[in-house]
C-alpha cells in the first residue's frame, strides 16, 4: 500500500505536467497560427493595394499621354493656320522675327513604357496567383474558413502527436522513475544492512 501511495503523487504530477504542456502547446499553436495568418493576410492586402495603385497610375499616365497628343495636334494646327496668315511675311517665325520652334513628339516613349508596365503588372498577377498554395486557393473565397482551419490545425496536430507518442513517453518516464526509486531503495537497504552488521560485530 505504501509503494502505491508514493507512486500516485508522481503519476498525478506527470499527468498535470503533460496536461499543462498540452494546453500550453495548444495555446502556442493557436497564437502562432493566428499571427502567421494575420501577417500573411496583411502582406497579401498590401500586395493587392500596390497592384491596384500601379494600375491606376498606368491609366492616369496613359490618359495624360492621350491629352498631350491631342494638345500637340491642336498646337500644330494653329501653327499651320498662323503660317498661312503670315505667308506674305515668310511665315509666323519671320513675321515675329524669332527663331522657329519645332515640336518633338516623345509620346511614343510614354506609350512603350506604359505597355511594359502593363505587361509587368500582368506577369506579377500571374506569379502571385501561381504562388498561392492549394490551401489558400481553395479557401480564397471564404477567409473565415481559412482562419478557422489554420487556427485549429496546429493544436490538432499537437494533440494527435501527444495521443500517439504520449503513452510511450509516459511509460518510459514512469519506468525510469521506478528504476531510480528501486536504486534508491536498494541503497537505503544496503546502508541499513551495513549499519546492522557493524552493530552486530
Swiss-Prot record:
Extracellular side: 1-148
Subunit structure as annotated in this protein's UniProt entry: The mature envelope protein (Env) consists of a trimer of SU-TM heterodimers attached by a labile interchain disulfide bond.
Processing after translation: Specific enzymatic cleavages in vivo yield mature proteins. Envelope glycoproteins are synthesized as an inactive precursor that is N-glycosylated and processed likely by host cell furin or by a furin-like protease in the Golgi to yield the mature SU and TM proteins. The cleavage site between SU and TM requires the minimal sequence [KR]-X-[KR]-R. The R-peptide is released from the C-terminus of the cytoplasmic tail of the TM protein upon particle formation as a result of proteolytic cleavage by the viral protease. Cleavage of this peptide is required for TM to become fusogenic.
Record-annotated site: Cleavage: 7-8, 187-188
Superkingdom, natural source: Viruses
Location of the motif CX6CC: 93-101
Protein name from the UniProt record: Envelope glycoprotein
Organism: Kirsten murine leukemia virus (KiMSV)
Upper classification of the organism: Viruses, Riboviria, Pararnavirae, Artverviricota, Revtraviricetes
Record-annotated membrane-spanning stretches: 149-169
Keyword match Chloroplast: no
Amino acid at each position: 500500500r505504501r509503494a502505491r501511495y508514493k507512486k500516485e503523487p508522481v503519476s498525478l504530477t506527470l499527468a498535470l505536467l503533460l496536461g499543462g504542456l498540452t494546453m500550453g502547446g495548444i495555446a502556442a499553436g493557436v497564437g502562432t497560427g493566428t499571427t502567421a495568418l494575420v501577417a500573411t493576410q496583411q502582406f497579401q492586402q498590401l500586395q493587392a493595394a500596390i497592384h491596384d495603385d500601379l494600375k491606376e497610375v498606368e491609366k492616369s499616365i496613359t490618359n495624360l499621354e492621350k491629352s498631350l497628343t491631342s494638345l500637340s495636334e491642336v498646337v500644330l494646327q494653329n501653327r499651320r493656320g498662323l503660317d498661312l496668315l503670315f505667308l506674305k511675311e515668310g511665315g509666323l517665325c519671320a513675321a515675329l522675327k524669332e527663331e522657329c520652334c519645332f515640336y518633338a513628339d516623345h509620346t511614343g516613349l510614354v506609350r512603350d513604357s506604359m505597355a511594359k508596365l502593363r505587361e509587368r503588372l500582368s506577369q506579377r498577377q500571374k506569379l502571385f496567383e501561381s504562388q498561392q498554395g492549394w490551401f489558400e486557393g481553395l479557401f480564397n473565397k471564404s477567409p473565415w474558413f481559412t482562419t478557422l482551419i489554420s487556427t485549429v490545425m496546429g493544436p490538432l496536430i499537437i494533440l494527435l502527436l501527444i495521443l500517439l507518442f504520449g503513452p510511450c513517453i509516459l511509460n518510459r518516464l514512469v519506468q525510469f522513475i521506478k528504476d531510480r526509486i528501486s536504486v534508491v531503495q536498494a541503497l537505503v537497504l544496503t546502508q541499513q544492512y551495513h549499519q546492522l552488521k557493524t552493530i552486530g560485530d
